[in-house]
Every structure is written in C-alpha cells, then in structure tokens.
Amino acid sequence: MPARLEGLHDHTPQPAPTKPRPPPDDKVSFLCDVHYEALDRKLTDLEIAGIVHAMIIGGLETTQYALEEQAQLLCENPGTFEHLRTDRAKLRNFVEETMRMRSPTHGLSTRMTSQDEVFQGVDVPAGSLLHVRFGAANVDEEEFSCPFDLDLDREAVTRHVTFSAGPRVCPGANLSRIEQQIAWGVLFDRLEIIEYGADNDWLHQPGIMLGTLRLNLAFRKAETPLSLGTGRNATRS
C-alpha cells in the first residue's frame, strides 16, 4: 500500500455508523415510533405485537378464507365457473355476493349495553356484552331475499357488512376486493373447471373466522388459456 494511504483502511469504517441514513419505512419501525396520545407514551412491545398479529389476520387470513369459500360455492353451483370464465362482467358481483353469503370474518365488534333492552323478545340487561355477528346480518331474510342463494344479479350487492361499517369499517376492504378479483381472474384464465377433490374433512378454523383448515380441489387445466383477467381492458389470447 502506498505510504500516502497507510491507515486509511482502519479509518474508513469508523465514521460510517455516524453518517445519516434513510429512516426505515417498515410498519414495525413505524409502530415503534408512534406516540400514543391518549396515554401520552410509546406503544409497549405487547401492544406492537398485537397490532402486527391483527394486521396478519386482517391482511392475509380474511382474503384467504374468502377465496376458499368462493371455491366451495363454485363447486356447489354448477355452471357458475364456466359462466364467469367466459364472461367477467359479473366477477365483481360474484366476489361481493359470496362474501355476503359466507363472510370470512363472522364478527369482531363487542359492545356493552348502557341500558336495559329487549331484542327480538330477549331481555338484555344493562352492562351485557354483545358480540355483533356480521355473518348473521348478511343472511337476514328481512334484508336479503333468498339469502342463501348465490345471485349474481342481486341488487345493491355491496350492502353486506362483511367489512363492518361506519367508523370501524375495515381499512383494507377495497384492497381485499381487488385481490379476490385478480385471483379469480387468473384462475378463470388458466382453468376450465374446479370440483371438490377427495378426502375433505371439513374441519374449520375455530373462532370468529369462517374457513376450512384444508380444502382439496380437483381441476382441469385449460388447453387454451384466456387472458380476460378481471374483465377490464382484456382480450382473449
């Protein structure tokens, strides 16, 4: 090494850690910096872990179970797969209608009554805890005619409360809708049919979620794949 560069190698790494670097932009780092205004403090590790856990459930399992239940409804309604495969005009309706029929999240919101009430003939004392069930509301015969029938022409197809409503509506609702439409667009392009496979045990995830732990499907790959996608600005190949 030339004399003029002696000692440079030892010096170079030293200032590197002190130089400014772009702040991390991941969600966990963001949560670590959040100031909890209500209690005037940072979030605890337990609170951060709980938020991350809820994000995984809300961002993955809900859409996963929606797709799984939609596959079941396609198996149980002959002709619907082929109809949607060749005509994507009702794909959005299919996603909304199936989420209404089999809400991936059956209920999340728990409320405490502030006064005595009578609900559908049942006395509910003040201080009672009520668990609001989205799944039950979505098949209410007073709100939806023939609620257990898959109707791709149902009016006001987004009236369901699968994503809750009001100030507590799911912030990822529209993302989930897009994910489902894209997923089925790809599957309709590549497959000709899906059917129930063998050895399904129909064991469901316990708790507030609706979804089987395993779903075996049989399918036939399309000899001539389509390229209709979600039906927007697409053509046949």
Language model regions located:
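Cytochrome P450
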Residues: 1-237
